[in-house]
Amino acid sequence: MIKMFHYGHPWRTFKWLIGLTPKFTDLKENGEYGEWLGRKFLKNKGFSILYLNWRSRKDRRYEIDLICMDNEILVFVEIRARSVNSFTTGFQTIGKRKRRALLKSFKAYLSENSHLPLNYRFDVIEVDLPSNCNGKVKLFHHENIAIFKDTLH
């Protein structure tokens, strides 16, 4: 069962399910579409989705896009949707401030939940969105990314 804290407008999801793509001009819709595509991609790879847009009970600013299980491994996923015309990749947009926020979010999740698996990792999914509705979306899955100087323990 997926626990969803916030996930956009249901009509948008329905449109995407029947094959209609966004206009790629609305940044919020682009982000939601990117998260939807990322989630769909991981499900097709056999991941179990535990949480969408998880937020800490203690501090609502701490947010994780997806929390999944890949067999026995707990996976924290950051999804970065960008225009294919961007000068930087989605992975490159995870700057110092975002890394600090992600680290705090992961630590909050680990401290607020018991019965955690022994192994966990951090993945990034880049979603390159076309500049128009006729273009193709490209997804890149970066597994087990080491973006923290500190450990999560």
List where the protein language model places each region:
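Domain-level recognition of nuclease-like catalytic cores that cleave nucleotide substrates
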Residues: 2-5, 111-153
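Catalytic cores of nucleic-acid endonucleases
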Residues: 81-131
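Acidic-basic catalytic patches of nuclease active cores, encompassing PD-(D/E)XK
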Residues: 1-53
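Short amphipathic alpha-helical face segments that pack within enzyme cores
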Residues: 37, 55, 101-104
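Hydrophobic/aromatic beta-strand patches that form the interior of the parallel beta-sheet core
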Residues: 50, 77, 123-125
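Conserved catalytic cores of phosphodiester-cleaving nucleases, focusing on short active-site segments
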Residues: 42, 64-85, 102
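Generic beta-structure capping elements
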Residues: 52, 79-82, 144-145
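Active-site metal-binding core of divalent-cation-utilizing nuclease and nuclease-like domains
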Residues: 48-74
